[in-house]
Amino acid sequence: MRVTDFSFELPESLIAHYPMPERSSCRLLSLDGPTGALTHGTFTDLLDKLNPGDLLVFNNTRVIPARLFGRKASGGKIEVLVERMLDDKRILAHIRASKAPKPGAELLLGDDESINATMTARHGALFEVEFNDQRSVLDILNSIGHMPLPPYIDRPDEDADRELYQTVYSEKPGAVAAPTAGLHFDEPLLEKLRAKGVEMAFVTLHVGAGTFQPVRVDTIEDHIMHSEYAEVPQDVVDAVLAAKARGNRVIAVGTTSVRSLESAAQAAKNDLIEPFFDDTQIFIYPGFQYKVVDALVTNFHLPESTLIMLVSAFAGYQHTMNAYKAAVEEKYRFFSYGDAMFITYNPQAINERVGE
């Protein structure tokens, strides 16, 4: 399969730079997996699409203010993007600089360069940085960090993004990008879903900066997926197995919830799914056998991204590309702050040939 098979034309005007004033007021394009039929509506239509007893699985990761500006003590400006927090004092990060810092280099971070840190080691493209400060890494980031808006949102971060680029149920700090399908859920909608009898469970996947890395190979089978830490606790496993047992659906909110659930299913020895606390490099593309997820809530993804490949594996390649073509024609808003899709599983997707 070629990466170019997942390309589509997207006018720049359709990239959303700000979210809708009300979280749940975005548009919703529904794709029926088995038939490819499309329905246009608004996000709150989800209430009618879910049945009592269906299980919604959310990702409760919380975005950290992961972008830091500063300079090397020796002079040159730097930009630091945290990939993950290693402990209370150390981070693993991408560093942009005219000349990469060497181990032992002193860094002065923050808009006022008040935070002292040392680059202690290099791991491939990533740098290990230790803060010389009494406070924990998280406190330092909350104090001097900027929200790491995706590269396609071409504007500086604003104070409002600290709330807007965060799901209302976010709980566990560690992500450098929001699980964006969840941004559309507000408390009134969650309350109505609960009142209808829709069950809810929470996995954790700390989204890394690798989620924005382009696929740099021609053939997708050659792509090496970035690694992210995921947690699927026992209560989620129990909720999934109970939903399946009573004939209800498991609906993943976002591709990160999909990757968490399917990672836990892949690693399971004795059951459909078992608890999972580990890094995952799961790469889902056409031909992948889904085991857990029956329906998916997701945003519109970048051309040639691993995420549009995941959706194609779920709904079928042709159905997915047709839906994206319709979304462009109907002027849906794309990417992190954009509109959403509701997709049901296409069991025939696994047999579809792509690019032939």
Curated annotation (Swiss-Prot):
**Uppermost EC category:** transferase
Q: Which Pfam families match?
A: Queuosine_synth
Which reactions is this enzyme annotated as catalysing? 7-aminomethyl-7-carbaguanosine(34) in tRNA + S-adenosyl-L-methionine = epoxyqueuosine(34) in tRNA + adenine + L-methionine + 2 H(+)
Q: Please tell me whether the keyword S-adenosyl-L-methionine is annotated for this protein.
A: yes
Task: Give the keywords, sorted.
Answer: Cytoplasm, Queuosine biosynthesis, S-adenosyl-L-methionine, Transferase
A Gene Ontology biological process noted in the UniProt record is: tRNA wobble guanine modification
Q: Where in the cell is it found?
A: Cytoplasm
Which pathway is this protein engaged in? tRNA modification; tRNA-queuosine biosynthesis
**What's the stated role of this polypeptide?**
Transfers and isomerizes the ribose moiety from AdoMet to the 7-aminomethyl group of 7-deazaguanine (preQ1-tRNA) to give epoxyqueuosine (oQ-tRNA).
- What's the protein called, per UniProt? S-adenosylmethionine:tRNA ribosyltransferase-isomerase
GN (gene name): queA
